[in-house]
């Protein structure tokens, strides 16, 4: 399974992020074959090393790398990605497995 993790910095207005999720990101990824789940943090983000520099965490799961790439290569996704980068969002892509 492939996961995409979005870490939104504290400098970002939460209403902007919530609007992006509700109106663009969630509807877009739910249309992709191989989409499994989308999860968003609920409440404050904590870290044992002190307050983290992020205010919102979003994790999206796909069955495979190819299915994830289908969404990442679309024009809508490219536009959204540029917007996310302009916000200073950290985006991580990674495989997961059972230990």
Kindly label every feature range from the protein language model:
Residues 1-99:
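Macromolecular interaction modules
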């Amino acid at each position: 399974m492939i996961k995409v993790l979005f870490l939104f910095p504290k400098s970002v207005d939460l209403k902007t992020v919530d609007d992006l999720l509700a109106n663009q990101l969630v509807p877009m990824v739910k249309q992709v074959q191989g989409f499994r789940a989308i999860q968003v943090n609920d409440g404050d983000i904590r870290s044992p090393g002190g307050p983290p520099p992020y205010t919102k965490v979003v994790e999206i799961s796909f069955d495979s790398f190819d299915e994830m790439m289908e969404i990442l290569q679309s024009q809508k996704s490219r536009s959204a990605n540029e917007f996310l980068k302009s916000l200073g969002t950290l985006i991580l892509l990674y495989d997961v497995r059972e230990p």
